[in-house]
Amino acid sequence: MAGHSKFKNIQHRKCAQDKKRAKVFTKLIREIVTAVKTGSSNIPENNPRLRNALTAARSQNLPKERIDKAINSADDANTENYTEIRYEGYAPNGIAIIVEALTDNKNRTAAEVRSSFTKYGGSLGETGSVNYLFKHCGVIQYPTNIASNEDIFEAAIEAGGDDIVSDAIFHTICTDIENFSKVLEFLTGKYGIPEDSYIGWIPLNTIIIDDTEKAEKLLKLVEALEESDDVQRVFSNYEFSDDVYEIIQGEE
């Protein structure tokens, strides 16, 4: 439960997301609405998905009035119903990509995702074509200054977490999906709202990108996918080498 962080690319993605706050808010609101509709309750205590969505929204500083409006709008018959879709494919150099989307128009979203893959040298595959390369799990992230490695490790284990990786930026806790809400609630009570929390896809192994040109091309694909309002999150199995990571961060 330690070692070189395979979550370094997550931090880079977060930096990119921070520059697109309005788009992030749109995605958070869409998840809140879907959580209420699919969970048949607008009460967080009775709806684990909504509870998780609200924690994520607060971690990104989504204003309370917008949260309340999203919850209330879910009961409105005129509010769009969103369909959950997962797309899978490959970026250049054999990098696996998983795209999770919430959409009110599947044809539009499929066209946008396929166009992004094609434009940047990737290929969109069938659902299930790459997910075997990932673990589907809950992810909770805290900045490293919130607690020591030892303390966060002990708290994560006590809460029911499965794995934790600490680096210079984040403590990243992974959990079984079934335990995600319980672990998130426990850690939130102990350390406050996390930097990020979600159910997603973590690579079982990573492919090291040690060429800046390849890294930049890969990021263009990922960023093009994230540009879509329908796309909630993008997951992949790449990791930048230290040298490439420093160069990419310097270009932000």
Swiss-Prot record:
GO MF annotation: an example: DNA binding
Which Gene Ontology cellular-component terms appear in the entry? cytoplasm
GO BP terms in the entry? regulation of DNA-templated transcription
Residues passing through the membrane, by range: none
Task: Give the matching InterPro entries.
Answer: Integrase-like_N (IPR017856), TACO1_YebC-like_2nd/3rd_dom (IPR048300), TACO1_YebC_N (IPR049083), Transcrip_reg_TACO1-like (IPR002876), Transcrip_reg_TACO1-like_dom3 (IPR026564), YebC-like (IPR029072)
The main location is cytoplasm
Keyword set for this entry?
Cytoplasm, DNA-binding, Transcription, Transcription regulation
Q: Where in the cell is it found?
A: Cytoplasm
Q: Looking at the keywords, is Transcription regulation present?
A: yes
Q: Which NCBIfam families match?
A: PRK00110.1, PRK12378.1, YebC/PmpR family DNA-binding transcriptional regulator
Q: Which family does it belong to?
A: Belongs to the TACO1 family.
Read off the PANTHER family from this record.
PTHR12532:SF11, TRANSLATIONAL ACTIVATOR OF CYTOCHROME C OXIDASE 1 (PTHR12532)
Q: Would you tell me the protein name for this molecule?
A: Probable transcriptional regulatory protein A1C_04175
Organism of origin is Rickettsia akari (strain Hartford)
